[in-house]
Amino acid sequence: MKEKHNPRRKYCLISGLAIIFSLWIIIGNGAKVQAETITVPTPIKQIFSDDAFAETIKDNLKKKSVTDAVTQNELNSIDQIIANNSDIKSVQGIQYLPNVTKLFLNGNKLTDIKPLANLKNLGWLFLDENKVKDLSSLKDLKKLKSLSLEHNGISDINGLVHLPQLESLYLGNNKITDITVLSRLTKLDTLSLEDNQISDIVPLAGLTKLQNLYLSKNHISDLRALAGLKNLDVLELFSQECLNKPINHQSNLVVPNTVKNTDGSLVTPEIISDDGDYEKPNVKWHLPEFTNEVSFIFYQPVTIGKAKARFHGRVTQPLKEVYTVSYDVDGTVIKTKVEAGTRITAPKPPTKQGYVFKGWYTEKNGGHEWNFNTDYMSGNDFTLYAVFKAETTEKAVNLTRYVKYIRGNAGIYKLPREDNSLKQGTLASHRCKALTVDREARNGGKLWYRLKNIGWTKAENLSLDRYDKMEYDKGVTAYARVRNASGNSVWTKPYNTAGAKHVNKLSVYQGKNMRILREAKTPITTWYQFSIGGKVIGWVDTRALNTFYKQSMEKPTRLTRYVSANKAGESYYKVPVADNPVKRGTLAKYKNQKLIVDCQATIEGQLWYRIRTSSTFIGWTKAANLRAQK
């Protein structure tokens, strides 16, 4: 049975509330509103750039032409604008109408509503059937009570978070999926969300003032969130279209029923496609042949508060046509399911001692080599065979390579294979040198290089680059001290990167607070750049340091504290470390003031608090400098 939301309900509600709102404007607190003004009489068309909107203002002020000049007092006299279906593309100039309380611009061609931002007295805004997407410019309209944005193609309504005073909201016929922000609008008594793409209505659970709620033509399957809305007079829930995530087709298909009433009980399907059956809590089908989807229709009368509604719709389960691909590696078979008509994900290439993997073929000996970038899964099961070819013999080359610093202990051999009886030493003494590769060979799937006049080593031990590359280089906030100075030095850049020069032995900085500025990673290790006393020193291996402060040690808290009488001369810092370069001042200026502690950290056994006033961030100080009572 088809139901239809009657639009007259919306406008009856609006008319009644409009009278109340108009009285509220008249008897309000008289607060002044900031708005743009004109200082001399100005032609209408110079103020309102859109021709159609200029005509609307002309008619409103009973002027003969849009070339007529108007004063700010005349513009101040306009308290409402009704210009539906007027081909208006822009409301530029409306910022000069500070006393507008009601604005009806349905059926126009508006996209940008930024000029509305300063209409502080606006209580009623109707923009149905436009092309408005961005709602952020409404955030300061604190008197806005009723808002209608139906038929706009809106998908993001997070801009409504700043309008908790709204009492009626109409968002039907849009593309909304996420209504989380509506949980903040607890004063709503009327809400229309029909004909959207909403499935999760949990954010509505706390809107207990709702009297009229329109949710038809969405993707809703669970009504539990509505159970507490006892003030409802009108509720619409018909024509839900619920689409499950696609699953693989099976001859005997079982799909859990997820349609739930307000009390959490399952709603029994009324009609099930393809001769399916319902065995609570599952819907079952016997599908000997592939079909691309199955579905069931549900219907459930619902009563919430005074509202009676028919909760009905369809649940559709899309099905994927899948077949089995078998990967055969010399008789060892691995199987996987793949959807018909899609590309197959290439498996990891297999290895075979003394052979090179050639590719996956449709036959053991020959056939078609499968191209994972262009070939698609057919509508039947099939096997792909791993085909290998004998390894190529070694060949002459002429290359230049460098030892990767972290591979200095890798072996050098008489022949291209890892055998201790053939080992001639390590690469350590050849670091930082340009080495000539005169031959290459493959063995066991590994590429080997012969270093001229030295011997064979794996290609993975060598690099095209003389210097290490940094994997990342980022700013950090931390403090550390030297833990192990032996054998460690400080460099202008991370060691073995281009331009790195020796600065000093690390032992020179033993016992000093080292402020960590940056972190970088090379193949050797992770490095810290540090400063002492405000002076940048250089880079050091992080393994040589003991980091006693990092931001992850900070924990949020909420306390009230006061400066202890005898601690006014103590300092506060940018971070919880007593280091002069990050010192920000003393506590004297905050004596007898109420301070808020919003974060704490324990650094080397010492508790620190991050403090601020109600309006100003101060910094970190030792907890011992503060007390709980004034």
Curated annotation (Swiss-Prot):
Keywords: Cell membrane, Cytoplasm, Heparin-binding, Leucine-rich repeat, Lipid-binding, Membrane, Repeat, Secreted, Signal, Virulence. Residues 31-76 form the LRRNT domain. Pfam families: Flg_new, GW, Internalin_N, LRR_4, LRR_adjacent. Residues 320-392 are annotated as: B repeat region. Residues 399-630 are annotated as: GW repeat region, necessary and sufficient for cell surface attachment, interacts with host C1QBP and with heparin. Disruption phenotype: Deletion of inlB alone decreases host cell entry; the reduction varies from 99% to 37% depending on the cell line tested. GO terms for cellular component: cytoplasm; extracellular region; peptidoglycan-based cell wall; plasma membrane. LRR repeats lie at residues 75-97, 98-121, 123-141, 142-163, 164-187, 189-207, 208-231. It comes from the Bacteria. Residues 241-330 form the LRRCT domain. Residues 393-467, 472-550, 553-630 form the GW domain. The N-terminus (36-79) resembles a truncated EF hand, the LRR region (80-240) has a curved form, while residues 241-321 form an Ig-like region; the whole region forms a curved tube. The LRR domain alone (31-241) binds mammalian MET and stimulates its Tyr-phosphorylation; the LRR plus Ig-like region (36-321) are required for receptor dimerization; adding the B-repeat allows the protein to scatter host cell colonies, and the GW domains, especially GW2 and GW3, potentiate MET activation. Mediates the entry of L.monocytogenes into normally non-phagocytic mammalian host cells. Its host receptor is hepatocyte growth factor receptor (HGF receptor, a tyrosine kinase, MET) which is tyrosine-phosphorylated in response to InlB. Downstream targets MAPK1/MAPK3 (Erk1/2) and AKT are phosphorylated in response to InlB, which also causes cell colony scattering. Complement component 1 Q subcomponent-binding protein (gC1q-R, C1QBP) has been suggested to also act an InlB receptor, but this is less certain. Interacts via its LRR repeats plus the Ig-like region with the extracellular portion (residues 25-741) of its receptor MET; MET can bind HGF, its endogenous ligand, and InlB simultaneously. Probably forms a dimer upon interaction with host MET, which subsequently allows dimerization of the host MET and subsequent host signaling; dimerization probably occurs via the convex surface of InlB. Prevention of dimerization does not block interaction with MET but prevents downstream action. NCBIfam families: GW_glycos_SH3 (NF033202), List_Bact_rpt (TIGR02543). This is Internalin B. It comes from Listeria monocytogenes serovar 1/2a (strain ATCC BAA-679 / EGD-e).
